[in-house]
Structure formats: structure tokens, C-alpha cells
Amino acid sequence: MSIPLPVQVDMVLEDLTEELCGLKEGTVFLQIEDGVVKTYGVRHRLENRVEPGAERDSQVVAVRPRQVELLREMATDVVKRRTQWTTGMMSYRFVMRKGSIQVSVDYKEQK
């Protein structure tokens, strides 16, 4: 039995938690083929990484585990709504603003 796509997306974001924490902004991308996540990763500029301890010294706010949880909830919710979508590219662009995470979703279906 195959793993449902929303569960796979949740697993991917859980796997990326450490990489996402400490970023001010970036994009999570997933390549999906026949309902299976084949490749995934995070794109970001190096200057968007906040070094440990830097948040205490300035107004800089970076992603923390709680924001990753919110991103996971939003990402899986989007996939649940796209029930007929099985192949293509999905990306979640995120940015931290005033302590909260803002996310936009882009998906491109391939037939």
C-alpha cells in the first residue's frame, strides 16, 4: 500500500526541519511523480541564514520549530485539497515577518 501524498509531504517537511530552522526566507520544493515525492529540498540565499545567537542581538527573526509545524500544516492542507493532482512540481515560498511565517504555494501539474 502506498503512503498518501499529504503524509509524504508532512514527512518531507519533518525531514527538512533542521535545515529550515534559522532561515529568514526560502522555498521548499517537491517533485512529485504518480503521487510519490521523488525529490525535494530547500532553496535559499546564504545571507538568509541566521547564525545561532544572532536573533538575541538584533531584530532578526528566523524560522523556529513552531513555524515549521505551521508550514507542515499548511502544506499538507494544500495537498489534501488537490485530490486529483498526482504529477508535477510543488513549491512553498516562506518568509518570516514580525515573528510569524508567511507562506505562498505554487504548483505546476504535468500531464
Task: Describe each PLM feature range.
Residues A54-Q102:
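Short, solvent-exposed interaction modules
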Residues M1-E25, F29-I32, E47:
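Long, hydrophobic N-terminal alpha-helical segment
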Residues E47-R49, A54-R56, G99-K111:
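Short, low-complexity, polybasic intrinsically disordered segments
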Residues V7-V9, E18-C21, E25, P52-A62, ...:
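Binding-site signature for planar aromatic cofactors or substrates
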